[in-house]
Every structure is written in structure tokens, then in C-alpha cells.
Amino acid sequence: MGKGIDGLKLKKRSEKLAFMEVKIGSTSSYCRLEGFTTQAFNANASEYNRQYVDEDTERTDVKGYSESINYNFDQYIGHPALSEIVKITENELTGTDAVRNILTVDMTSNTSGGQYEATLSAFAIVPSSNGDSTDCMTYSGDFKSRGTKRAVQVTMDADFENATIVGGSTVASQSAKSTEKNVEVKK
């Protein structure tokens, strides 16, 4: 049996945090997505499959991705990010009104400067169901990719409730450009 991983630390699911861009007043802030019972990432890779006449096996290439995140959460009244998703669901928002930027932060990538590696993407919030529990109000659906994913560096507040993008890379895709001027950016 292999023992190469015996001395290594296993990465916990709780060490990958998500933050949604929420407009508060005249600025936007990345608020932590809390209260989620499911946040499953799906690559949804597009494939090009073919078999050449002189070969007995197929060949496969990945030609693109359409990432989605399946979600379920318990509603906490007054939580800004959850309130955004509830607003989109309850008001049946469509088009760019249902698009939000989401940061996914790797908490194991902390540097000596207090920065973390993260990815920034614009997602369409696609609601599925709500109210399917008698324990509390629940919502479910999918965040579906709306463009190119971008690598960024972020800092966190003391409680890990808010993330701030470091530098000038705030745009995840063209659909997110309208919020670029309102995002707090540290330089």
C-alpha cells in the first residue's frame, strides 16, 4: 500500500469559501455565502469525440467548460448575499438582472501578506425550488457560468465575512463590467 499521503494534510471542504458581490449603498462588497447545505461544483466539460478509421479506439478532447454550482441553503433573514438570491427567486428576475459575481477563495493559499488565491466568475442565478422543508425556509438552484473565470488575489476582513480583491482585476466577464466601477479594490 502507498504511504505517500500519510504525512499530508487532507483539504477540508470548509477551506474553500464562496463570496457573492452584493451592492450595499453606492458600493459593492463580496459577502460570504453562508447557510448553504450544498455547494457542489460541476465542470460541465464539452467534449469532441471521434474515432479515426485507422484506429480501434476513440479519442476525446475537452473543447470548453460551462461551470455550474448546484446550491441549497437555509434562509437567514438579513443576510445580504442570501437576500440577493431570494430577491432573484421571488421576483423571477431574468437576463442580467439575475447575474452576480462570485469569488471562490482557497483558504489554504494564505500568503505572508495575508492574501489568498481566488477565482472570480459571473454566474446566472437559476432558481429551482424553495420551501421544500418544514424545518426552515430553504432555496435551491444552480449558479451557471456567464463567461470566463479569472484568477485574482483577495484579502479578508477579521471575521472572514467579506473579501476584497487586491489589484485592478475585478471583471470576470463582459456581463460583469457594469459593476466594475462600484467594487472596492485595494492597491
Predicted regions mapped to residue ranges:
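Short beta-strand and beta-hairpin "edge-sheet" elements
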Residues: Q39, T104-A151
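Solvent-exposed edge beta-strands and adjacent loop segments
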Residues: G2-I77, F123-D135
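Short, cysteine-centered beta-strand-loop-beta hairpins and adjacent loop/turn segments enriched
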Residues: Y76-L82, K149-Q153
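Residues at beta-strand starts and edge strands
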Residues: Y65-I69, D97-N101, M137-Y139
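Intrinsically disordered, low-complexity terminal/linker regions enriched in Pro/Ser/Gly
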Residues: V154-K187
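Short, acidic/charged, Gly/Pro-enriched secondary-structure junctions
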Residues: L82-E117
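Short secondary-structure transition/capping segments
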Residues: K9-K16, R146-F160
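Short, low-complexity, polar/charged sequence segments that are solvent-exposed and flexible
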Residues: I88-T94, S121-I125, D142-K144, E161-I165
